[in-house]
């Protein structure tokens, strides 16, 4: 073991007669060497350059130290590595791994670090939709939204026969006086109400969950069909989206839907016989029992036509638990029991993805004063999520991390300590020899390199 002495440090007792000390004085060392996989993932999917192209920079080139592409990459890679707070970058701008990922090793001016600190990144997040005197970097929301759909389409090797788009709205609690802040009775807090499809879109919480869904679906589906003209599309969502305008749009545009339906007395009366049968059998067996029924239905005022409803008549814990869904799928295409249990209930997986975005990628960190800035933050978080998902999909299939959450991937594969050796010709990251995930890390690195080569040299 190498013996070192330090003037300043922390004392942690002794082990076998040797004093244990620690200090932040090792120089070129990084705790995020595994993040090299993120750079390899970006080369495999070509995301960061296209995301940076969604920004317009009107700063004077001769005065610029940090270009937009560097700033965007630094922010997204930082979030993916677990640094959601811009304050972290005042130290990370000296980190060799972050410099490698951002693609900038040396500063042009002596008084600058190679990459940006918190103030410069904050100005990026506060960028306007158009350049102003004090904000020279602007972003194009439509281009960013289009890129998100492009990345989804490109994640498929070939056009699928059918895709299912899950919609959901969730609360993003507010703890300040942000623009668009309203109290939401269901969530019992002041919040935003972002609409998630495969990315998030911020809305004021005063809106209905389904508000804006028609416009978003029209845009997304049109873009998907330009690439996959024959794909069948099913929209799946809870009862908050069972609105006549959305269902009518789906019917007019050849899009299938499967939405939860809020129960009422008329619907429950429709399945009274099935509930009685389920209750009788439950009393005999002592177990929950359920029956299913499919029927045509129309509301008294809000719907413009009759639609197929599938009901689950369930008796559990001594009481009725009826549930309903409305769908455009015909009976000959999908039987009632399979439709509810296998198709509709599978939407619960989206709840896990939303939790992953908010807990592992910090998508609820929306403390900027304006909705515009908070929306841009949400897009940064979304890009970091896409990057980690691509790492999982391309590099980690058939490994122990194939189904791991983004947080687990970060902890086990990205948070690896390394000594950094810099020479004229190379930068060597000497990672910890005792890394438990070294084998899977190596597999991912090889797979991502192959994918990047295939992207650079398409057949």
What do these predicted regions represent?
Residues 186-191, 218, 252-267:
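Acidic, His- and aromatic-enriched active-site or binding-groove loops in soluble protein domains
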Residues 4-23, 256-359, 445-459:
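An anionic, glycine-rich sequence signature occurring as long contiguous blocks
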Residues 1-189, 193-209, 217-222, 226-227, ...:
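Dynamic "connector" segments at or just before major functional cores
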Residues 168, 232-242:
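Acidic/histidine-rich, metal-coordinating catalytic segments
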Residues 90-92, 105-107, 233, 396-405:
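Short, glycine/acidic-rich hinge or "gate" loops at secondary-structure transitions
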Residues 35, 388-390, 394-411, 415:
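Conserved nucleotidyltransferase catalytic core and NTase-mimicking acidic/glycine-rich helix/loop elements
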Residues 61-70, 368-378, 404:
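Structural motif
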Residues 41, 339-376, 380-392:
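Short amphipathic alpha-helical "interface-anchor" segments enriched in bulky aromatics
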């Amino acid at each position: 073991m190498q013996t070192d002495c330090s003037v300043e440090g922390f004392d942690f007792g002794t082990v076998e007669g040797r004093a244990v000390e620690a200090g932040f004085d090792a120089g070129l060392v990084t705790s995020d060497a595994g993040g090299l996989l993120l750079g390899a993932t970006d080369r495999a999917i070509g995301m960061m350059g296209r995301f940076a192209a969604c920004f317009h920079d009107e700063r004077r080139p001769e005065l610029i130290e940090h270009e937009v592409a560097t700033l965007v990459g630094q922010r997204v890679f930082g979030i993916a590595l677990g640094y959601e707070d811009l304050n972290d970058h005042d130290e990370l701008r000296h980190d060799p791994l972050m410099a490698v990922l951002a693609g900038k090793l040396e500063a042009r001016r002596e008084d600058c670090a190679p990459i940006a600190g918190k103030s410069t990144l904050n100005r990026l997040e506060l960028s306007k939709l158009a350049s102003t005197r004090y904000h020279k970097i602007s972003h194009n929301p439509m281009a960013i939204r289009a890129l998100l759909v492009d990345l989804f389409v490109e994640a498929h090797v070939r056009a699928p026969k059918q895709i299912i788009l899950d919609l959901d709205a969730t609360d993003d609690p507010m703890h300040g006086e942000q623009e668009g802040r309203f109290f939401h009775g269901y969530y019992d807090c002041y919040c935003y109400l972002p609409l998630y499809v495969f990315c998030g879109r911020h809305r004021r919480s005063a809106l209905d969950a389904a508000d804006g869904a028609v416009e978003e679906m029209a845009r997304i589906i049109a873009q998907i069909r330009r690439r996959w003209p024959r794909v069948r599309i099913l929209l799946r969502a809870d009862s908050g989206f069972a609105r006549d305008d959305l269902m009518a749009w789906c019917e007019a545009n050849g899009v299938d839907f499967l939405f939860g339906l809020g129960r009422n007395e008329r619907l429950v009366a429709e399945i009274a016989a099935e509930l009685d049968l389920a209750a009788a059998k439950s009393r005999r067996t002592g177990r929950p029992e359920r029956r299913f029924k499919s029927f045509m239905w129309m509301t008294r005022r809000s719907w413009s036509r009759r639609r197929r409803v599938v009901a689950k008549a369930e008796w559990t814990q001594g009481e009725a638990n009826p549930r309903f869904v409305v769908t455009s799928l015909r009976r000959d295409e999908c039987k009632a029991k399979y439709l509810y249990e296998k198709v509709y209930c599978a939407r619960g997986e989206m709840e896990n993805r939303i939790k992953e975005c908010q807990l592992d990628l910090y998508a609820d960190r929306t403390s900027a004063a304006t909705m515009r800035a908070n929306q841009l933050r949400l897009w940064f978080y979304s890009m970091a999520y896409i990057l980690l998902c691509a790492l999982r999909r391309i590099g980690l299939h058939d490994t122990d991390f194939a189904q791991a959450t983004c947080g687990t991937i970060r902890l086990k594969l990205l948070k690896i300590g390394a000594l950094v050796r810099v020479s004229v010709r190379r930068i060597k990251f000497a990672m910890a020899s005792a890394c438990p995930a070294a084998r899977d890390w190596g597999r991912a690195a090889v797979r991502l390199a192959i994918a990047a080569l295939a992207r650079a040299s398409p057949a």
